[in-house]
């Protein structure tokens, strides 16, 4: 698993298992597996919401031109995400 935070042009921060989509040697996009949008709340709380909550898709392709940056999540955020995808809740605080 490559758990990363993907920062999108839409100003959303999405945490997911991220895979590159290739065409030859070029990255044309990313596949987000079990993506969740991160929101920041008061007192440094992070809340997880399903990305595309009206869809049953668990794998969502994103074109590379929509990605601003991909970063490594803090360990606490990564652990909360992993708990979330294990089916413990639909949205959680960290």
Question: Where are the regions a protein language model picked out?
Answer:
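Conserved RNA-binding domains used in RNP assembly and mRNA/RNA metabolism
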Residues: 1-94
